[in-house]
Regions:
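Compositionally biased terminal segments of proteins
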Residues: 1-195
């Protein structure tokens, strides 16, 4: 026990924290195979200018069977070959697949309604250790961070200010509670035995 790293669930982690050298290594292999992907999440936030920690690499991928196969093949460059344990079609089926290898890589079908095709419309390619890597734009990241997760709040604050400074002010979305209110109304009717 002691100071070993832990994942978000508090379980001991066997993966080390990734860095931009990992982004370059994985990106080079994804590019070599012609896989369609865009970096989202923590590394994209860091690339946008917000210095923060991240424990994984988040990739939004095009969810065709062929592209998913290419992405998994590219990730087999990691030493434990954990991507080989992922069944074909898993990302399409489960929306997010976590691959725990030397570093943790999350493969995503979409986030907050943003899929690969949408993210690529304004993605920005940056050289990372000489490798061209597509990153989600700050506006796309803003859209993808509209969650109830407490850990997304600092990212939203940063992105809102960055977008405003860049001339693209955004407003915090007003949550659509109509569905929740309707369910509550029906539940109260059943509870009280009325119409």
């Amino acid at each position: 026990m002691g100071m070993e790293p832990h994942d978000e669930a508090g379980e001991p982690s066997v993966s080390r924290e990734p860095d931009f050298a990992d982004i370059a290594r994985i990106g080079a292999e994804l590019n070599r195979l012609g896989a369609r992907y865009v970096v989202v999440g923590g590394f994209a936030i860091i690339r946008a200018g917000y210095p923060r920690m991240t424990t994984d690499i988040d990739l939004l991928i095009e969810c065709t069977p062929e592209n998913e196969r290419l992405v998994l093949e590219a990730l087999s460059i990691l030493p434990d070959k954990a991507s080989r344990l992922v069944e074909p079609g898993a990302v399409e089926k489960y929306q997010v697949v976590r691959i725990g290898d030397e570093v943790t890589v999350d493969l995503m079908k979409s986030g907050c309604g943003v899929d690969y095709a949408t993210a690529m419309k304004d993605a920005q390619t940056h050289e990372v250790h000489g490798v061209p890597v597509p990153f989600a734009s700050p506006l796309t990241l803003w859209r993808m961070k509209q969650t109830v997760r407490e850990k997304d709040i600092p990212d939203r604050i940063f992105l809102k200010q960055k977008l405003s400074d860049d001339g693209t002010p955004v407003e915090d979305p007003v949550p659509d509670v109509s569905g929740i209110l309707e369910k509550l109304r029906r539940w109260l009717i059943r509870l009280l035995g009325g119409k």
